Amino acid sequence: MTRGPVRLDVAISYALPRAGLPAAVSFRRWVAAALKGRIREADLAIRVVDAKEGQSLNRHYRGKDYATNVLSFPAEVPEGLPKGVKFPLLGDLVICAPVVAREADEQGKALNAHYAHLTVHGVLHLLGWDHEDDKEAEAMEQLEREILAELGIDDPYAGER
């Protein structure tokens, strides 16, 4: 576990009007919570998109022709990077605002809490976490619960049990 302050650079862009969307400071707080104790230095980008762009990216990169809530694109460490040279670039997150809003409504969740959950979920993917099998999924979900609890956000999986 990494201790000490985190140097964090989060570039946030909005591909649609910001009204009703979380402020950049909220996204930064959620990212910092996900990284706390795990990594000391990180650069990443978050892009909040509409359904059309979300669908296009999901189709292009995952072969799935629908908009999804969050896409994670981990950075690749350049080959031949000298040992000891830091490479703080984590990658990019794409969050599809209409999908997040629809899911929050359908699941009876506060919109900001759902954005926080999906941001944390996406950052964990950038750190190498996955949920391809039940054991991985449970471990990742438990970590998400712990991070969100530190942010004062209820268990996002409580209604699924």
Swiss-Prot record:
SUPFAM superfamilies: Metalloproteases ('zincins'), catalytic domain (SSF55486)
HAMAP family: Endoribonucl_YbeY (MF_00009)
Entry similarity comment: Belongs to the endoribonuclease YbeY family.
Subcellular location as annotated: Cytoplasm
Gene Ontology cellular component terms for the protein in this record: cytoplasm
Cofactor note as given: Binds 1 zinc ion.
Protein name: Endoribonuclease YbeY
The enzyme's E.C. designation: 3.1.-.-
Binding site for Zn(2+): 121, 125, 131
Keyword Cytoplasm belongs to the record: yes
PROSITE patterns in alphabetical order: UPF0054
Gene Ontology BP annotations: rRNA processing
Keyword terms: Cytoplasm, Endonuclease, Hydrolase, Metal-binding, Nuclease, Ribosome biogenesis, rRNA processing, Zinc
One Gene Ontology MF term: zinc ion binding
InterPro entries xrefs: MetalPrtase_cat_dom_sf_prd (IPR023091), YbeY (IPR002036), YbeY_CS (IPR020549)
Primary localization: cytoplasm
Obligatory cofactor(s): Zn(2+)
Highest taxon above the source species: Bacteria
Function: Single strand-specific metallo-endoribonuclease involved in late-stage 70S ribosome quality control and in maturation of the 3' terminus of the 16S rRNA.
A matching Pfam family: YbeY
UniProt xrefs under NCBIfam families: rRNA maturation RNase YbeY
